[in-house]
A protein has these predicted regions:
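Short acidic, glycine/proline-enriched helix-loop-strand junctions
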Residues: 74, 111-135
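NAD(P)-binding Rossmann-fold cofactor-contacting core
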Residues: 29-32, 39-59
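Structural motif
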Residues: 77-78, 102
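ADP-ribose/adenylate-binding Rossmann-like module
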Residues: 95-118
Length: 147
């Protein structure tokens, strides 16, 4: 797949099919982009599950934070990665192992080798994009209204 440009249809399908999103690198600090994105996704009707070993066991925006994707006790539709590109590969591999249908790497996060591994396993991949930007750009309704 060409990861330079994604069709609106591809992004729309991902963002309307996913209901449970694990946020790798979620932060309890309000000023952090991962915290703001998680709050936005919750407001839009997604179940956002924080994953951060430094905050494991804590509550972030009303959700228990897990140390790893393997610790999340429910199915994950999409994994949203807030890690530097150099650290994205292990998160992608963990997403594959967890059975996620989609791996989404945030703005300025790109790992082509990890993307290829995911796609070889049938996992959809988005890199260098933010759902909190794409949802309003695509004019997607909140999940509860869309279903």
């Amino acid at each position: 797949m060409n990861h330079e440009n994604y069709s609106d249809a591809y992004l729309r399908a991902i963002l309307t099919d996913a209901m449970t999103i694990a946020i790798v690198g979620a932060s309890p600090r309000r000023e952090r982009p991962s915290h703001r994105a998680m709050a936005y996704l919750q407001r839009r009707g997604y179940r956002a599950i924080p994953v951060n070993p430094n905050a494991a066991g804590d509550t972030i925006l009303g959700e228990t934070c897990y140390a790893s994707l393997a610790d999340v006790p429910e199915p994950i539709d999409m994994v949203d990665i807030f890690r530097r590109s150099q650290l994205a590969g292990p998160a992608v591999d963990a997403a594959i192992a967890a059975g996620a249908k989609v791996v989404w790497m945030q703005l300025d996060v790109r790992d082509d080798a990890a993307a290829a591994r995911a796609e070889a396993r049938g996992v959809k991949v988005v890199m260098n994009r933010c759902p909190a930007i794409e949802i309003p750009r695509l004019r997607l309704p909140p999940l509860s209204a869309a279903r």
